[in-house]
Amino acid sequence: MTTLLEKSKRLRTAHQAGFALLFSIAGPAWAQAVESSPATLWYGGPILTMAGDRPNMVDAVVERDGKIVYAGKVAQARKIAGTAAKEQNLGGATLLPGFVDAHSHFAMMMQVASGVDLQDPDHPINDIPSLIAALRTGIQARQIAPGGWVIAWQYDDAKLAEKRHITRADLDAAFPDHKIVLIHFTGHGLVTNSAAMAAAGITDSTPNPPGGITLRDASGKLTGVFFENAAYPVYLKIPPLSPEQRRAALDEAQRRYASNGFTHAQEGAASLGDMEALLKAGAQGLIKLDLALLPTSQTLDSLLGRPDVRFGSYQGHVKLAGIKFVLDGSPQARTGYFTRPYANGAPDGHHPWHGTPNMSQEAFNADAARAHSRGWQIFVHANGDAAIDMAIKGFDTLGLTKKADARPVVIHSQFQRPDQLKAYQRIGVGPAYFSNHTYYFADIHRSNFSADVVGFISPFASALKAGLQPSNHSDSPVTPLDPMTQLWSSMARQSKTGVVNGPDQRLTAWQGLHMLTTGPAWQVFEEKRKGQIKPGMLADFVILDKNPLTTPIEAIRSIKIMRTVKEGKTIWSAGQ
């Protein structure tokens, strides 16, 4: 693939200037000059260009060689497309730029596809016996032999009637011969049985690591519940997928993204193993959508010693986009780091509890400086306002400014204070917000924090007013990979119990679609290639059965994906 991004900002700017000049040439003359293969003409329905602050539509778009060569009137489009063009009548369906994933976990989706799914809608789990039954079914279906690892995903203790975590003792009684690991749906913790603990070298005398949370029973014995840094020893022992499993999981993960209209996906916390496997898959031509990888800060020492590692440019549809730092945990699991205490206390019940940072300010500053010195973009996970303070202090230590255009991204930025928006504006931070929290988790948040604090989570409207470039993400598999739910939640901000949180932060449909297209494209320096329908952009499209701009808010979630097109080629269509 032609590379438009380089590690050096100077080179990136030169590329962008060159393409801006190229596409300033008159459409028809340029299109005829470079005609090399039959074009495709799309027409017959609303085409949302996503250009500008107000709704902007055209009647037709022409694609040739994977790029858009014209967007405008049908008659002119036919002249430019030529007599050999293939015509695609939308039949009233709506076409817009392919969705750009602002943050999710592609590699984790591969694992979920190959593991036991604890949120299977056909087998709902509502108590510990039904959870154990689901694990037994998973073991039998996968024919996992005694002594083998059983990895289950999407574990949610809040759904259990017992109102507690399943424990090591529960799992030992049911599965004495397997190594059991239940990955919490937040991705920030897990529960294991004794066999898995032993494999990870964890005993009851193992101390709690800095930035880690372990739960113990009244006798001081570990319950098998580990969060944040305490979970890493177990994560590191989970065996990798076999080549056959990896290929099947890769195909399934791509299908899930493409079927939801995404032409650009992200692995937001890549290990070295993830990075190597996905780069190899890209080089083998196995990846059909664009995939941005964010290696975690734990990989930094290894990456700095490798001259072959390239950031910012695609290799077979895969690129290393930047380094990911995780400063805190999850507010719904009460592991996010706050300046104010949680009303419900710590996960083990003690008070006062503000959460804890996953790394020190000094460590973050030092490692971020090492990455920044190589020209690598900085991505930071920060949910609580205290963690966001840490991110801002680190950026200031690096001397980052909006003018420098380093575009640090703070993923989640959930419990942001108004004063922190001013710092984001000064530094040039791109906030990757998470509006699904207002639906899935706001009721939990309101039990811990005041209504005004919860009303300011994912403050889209305030961020736009401050001149920022926000995006919206699902953090899948934390919440479903469903862009229409993302759009709806950014417009409605309504919780599961019907409470509206922060009505002044609601977006219009047009603004909400920007958070799924232009916003995330800008955050990864791809605004010259993706996110809009105009000449020079990649022909990345999603086709919807209804127009979000004319669909009532309450019906937004019912909008269906009909087709996903990557660089002019259909990579998924309904009914496949």
Model-derived regions, located:
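Boundary at the C-terminal end of the N-terminal hydrophobic targeting segment
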Residues: 29-33
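Beta-rich accessory regions
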Residues: 567-569, 574-575
